[in-house]
UniProtKB/Swiss-Prot annotation:
This is Holliday junction branch migration complex subunit RuvA. Residues 157-205 are annotated as: Domain III. It holds the Pfam family RuvA_C. GO terms for biological process: DNA recombination; DNA repair. InterPro entries: DNA_helicase_Holl-junc_RuvA_I, Hlx-hairpin-Hlx_DNA-bd_motif, NA-bd_OB-fold, RuvA, RuvA_2-like, RuvA_C, RuvA_C_sf. It comes from the Bacteria. GO terms for cellular component: cytoplasm; Holliday junction helicase complex; Holliday junction resolvase complex. Has three domains with a flexible linker between the domains II and III and assumes an 'L' shape. Domain III is highly mobile and contacts RuvB.
Amino acid sequence: MIGRLKGILVEKHAPEVLIDVGGVGYELQMPLTSFYELPLPGAEVIVYTHFVVREDAQLLYGFIHKEERSLFRLLIKANGVGPKLALTILSGMTAKEFIGCLERDDIATLIKLPGVGKKTAERLLVEMRDKLKSLMEASMGAEREFVLKSNFTPAPVAATVEEDAIAALLSLGYKPQQASKAVSSAFQEGMDPEQLIKAALKSML
């Protein structure tokens, strides 16, 4: 199993990244909470990973913080939650915010995430509550390990900030109309994609 990668960030297009490790390029999917802590392409990064093998694909998921990976692993063990939905949940809220939902029995916030219906939210509260202590310990002991060593100048990007933000939300399962409306209402002049996506997600929660 691949548990950790240290290499050069080659490309990043939310939620996917490409990391070069000794001449081998690893494609990963990351929750947006981790994705937007990455440096510019050309920098060295360290990410914690979870490897998923399916009949039709082998997928690698990456996380800046160990507690996010721990929560991801707990989520995919919950009934009805696969890697895609777990990634969506962690893109919509941080590990600490998710723990807060468990503590408050906050179904209303959880069901605002795409793919999370009332039954799934209720099931998550029941199944994850017993694991709350270990989640809190992991969250408090989180490690943040990435190194910025870049003099790399990224090539100009054709897509606008709004297009980048909408594309990221669509990849998480939001409907086109929902993503477009959230981005349009949250957009302010001078925002970068990270700020806009965070604001758009916040407006939907």
